[in-house]
């Protein structure tokens, strides 16, 4: 077989099947037969035409697990038949960020499935620098290494230590991942979300304390969880302006806020509150190879699992016909994976 099925987002709200030649891996590339692909908010927003800096047509999908079925030249440490996850961030390796090891915020970053074609296809050729061995991990779990890695990067940015009291605001996939990883790192974790369904999901899957940030006594409830104090570290995964503006009110003096959720606008908070607490506030973008490696290790150890965030599975063969109904309009969806 020399051709493959590819699902292309031709334009907003239009997914079409096409046949393409199976790519031939170039030097320092591996050909991957796709096993599973996670569905991200990026894939949903791109379908709706709401993803900035996005061009059509595009093959979506950047949370990828597959099996190596072909290797280019100059590759010694990978082999055919090996299961791998894809690190979708292709960095230039030349800008100041890359040279300082922060390839996650490369000035010229190109993301597989966003800026170049991704995993909604049967095969994909990937630079070997963007491959993480994932043998021994369930393929659906391995497809979720990427979102877990984003969570791991936020936890690393927060410099969370064992025993620290951490509040995660927002119980979508990234917030769930951050809570799970902070817990695995030994922190005392509380999760806040306004959605009853998401709070129930966290209570069932992660067995962590849950709070409703819209409750009138939210401050008192938070202090009750942390022995009378506010949080030492807050990770905000909401991307919600009001929630992000309020984070400075949720940390104790000397506390840290990390924004891993993105709001496409301006934020505003009390400067006196910010200063008197000597707040450390930072953003968290994408993930580095070190974050991917940590997630792979935690999955292999059973400390984080796909079931912590995964709620739905979709067969690739019928995705064009079911995407709008079962993904876009599915109010119960927290995290979905495409199976091949």
Curated annotation (Swiss-Prot):
Name the keywords, alphabetized.
Metal-binding, NAD, Oxidoreductase, Zinc
Q: Which InterPro entries does the entry link to?
A: ADH-like_C (IPR013149), ADH-like_N (IPR013154), ADH_Zn_CS (IPR002328), GroES-like_sf (IPR011032), NAD(P)-bd_dom_sf (IPR036291), PKS_ER (IPR020843), Zn_alcohol_dh (IPR050129)
Q: Effect of gene disruption?
A: Cells lacking this gene fail to grow on L-galactonate as sole carbon source.
Per the record, pH dependence is: Optimum pH is 8.0.
Please, which domain of life does this record's source organism belong to? Bacteria
- Cross-referenced PROSITE patterns: ADH_ZINC (PS00059)
What does the entry say induces or represses the expression of this protein? Answer: Highly up-regulated during growth on L-galactonate.
The protein's name is L-galactonate-5-dehydrogenase
Task: Tell me the organism.
Answer: Escherichia coli (strain K12)
The record lists the lineage as: Bacteria, Pseudomonadati, Pseudomonadota, Gammaproteobacteria, Enterobacterales
Q: Which gene encodes it?
A: lgoD
């Amino acid at each position: 077989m020399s051709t493959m099925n590819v699902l292309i987002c031709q334009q907003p709200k239009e997914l079409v099947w096409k046949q393409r030649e199976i790519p031939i891996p170039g030097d320092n590339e591996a050909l991957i037969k796709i096993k599973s692909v996670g569905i991200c908010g990026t894939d949903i927003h791109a379908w709706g035409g709401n993803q900035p800096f996005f061009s059509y047509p595009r093959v979506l999908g950047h949370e990828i697990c597959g099996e190596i079925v072909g290797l280019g030249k100059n590759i010694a440490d990978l082999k055919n038949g090996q299961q791998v996850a894809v690190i979708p961030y292709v960095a230039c390796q030349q800008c100041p960020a890359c040279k300082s090891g922060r390839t996650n915020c490369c000035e010229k970053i190109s993301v597989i499935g966003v800026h170049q074609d991704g995993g909604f296809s049967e095969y994909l050729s990937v630079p070997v620098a963007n491959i993480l061995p994932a043998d021994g991990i369930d393929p659906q779990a391995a497809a979720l290494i990427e979102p877990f890695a984003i969570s791991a990067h936020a936890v690393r940015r927060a410099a969370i230590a064992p025993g620290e009291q951490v509040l995660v605001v927002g119980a979508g996939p990234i917030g769930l991942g951050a809570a799970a990883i902070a817990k695995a790192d030994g922190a005392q974790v509380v999760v806040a979300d306004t959605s009853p369904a998401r709070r129930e999901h966290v209570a069932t899957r992660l067995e962590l304390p849950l709070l409703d940030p819209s409750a009138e006594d939210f401050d008192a409830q938070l202090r009750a969880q942390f022995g009378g104090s506010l949080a030492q570290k807050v990770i905000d995964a909401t991307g919600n302006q009001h929630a992000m503006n309020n984070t400075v009110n949720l940390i104790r003096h000397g506390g840290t806020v990390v924004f891993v959720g993105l709001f496409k606008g301006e934020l505003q908070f009390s400067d006196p509150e910010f200063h008197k607490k000597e707040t450390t506030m930072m953003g968290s973008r994408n993930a580095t190879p070190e974050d991917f490696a940590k997630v792979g290790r935690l999955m292999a150890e059973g400390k984080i699992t796909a079931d912590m965030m995964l709620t739905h599975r979709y067969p690739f063969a019928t995705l064009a016909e079911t995407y709008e109904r079962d993904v876009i309009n599915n109010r119960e969806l927290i995290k979905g994976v495409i199976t091949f």
